[in-house]
């Protein structure tokens, strides 16, 4: 099994970050597990903050990729 599939919390965070950078609604978090949903929302908030601070989606993608390593 690949490492990225094992760590659900980190994966949820990165997906939330990317959704936030894309300007998507936080209502899109469809995580059933409470902690994974919280990680997604944390990533979403940081993604929105970075978007508001002027990071481009490309910069945000590099930042999100550094989280997953």
Swiss-Prot record:
Subcellular location, record wording: Cytoplasm
Swiss-Prot/TrEMBL GO biological process terms: regulation of translation
A GO cellular component entry from the record: cytoplasm
Signal peptide (UniProt feature, chain positions): none
Top-rank taxon, per record: Bacteria
Entry keyword set: Cytoplasm, Translation regulation
The keyword Cytoplasm belongs to this UniProt entry's keyword annotation: yes
Database matches in InterPro entries: Ribosome_modulation_factor, RMF_sf
Keyword Cytoplasm in annotation: yes
Family: Belongs to the ribosome modulation factor family.
Protein purpose: During stationary phase, converts 70S ribosomes to an inactive dimeric form (100S ribosomes).
Protein's name in the database: Ribosome modulation factor
């Amino acid at each position: 099994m690949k490492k990225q599939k094992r760590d659900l919390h980190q994966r949820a965070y990165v997906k939330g970050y990317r959704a936030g950078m894309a300007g998507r609604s936080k209502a899109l978090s469809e995580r059933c597990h409470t902690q994974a949903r919280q990680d997604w929302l944390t990533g979403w908030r940081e993604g929105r903050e970075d978007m508001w601070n002027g990071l481009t989606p490309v910069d945000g993608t590099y930042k999100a990729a550094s989280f997953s390593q």
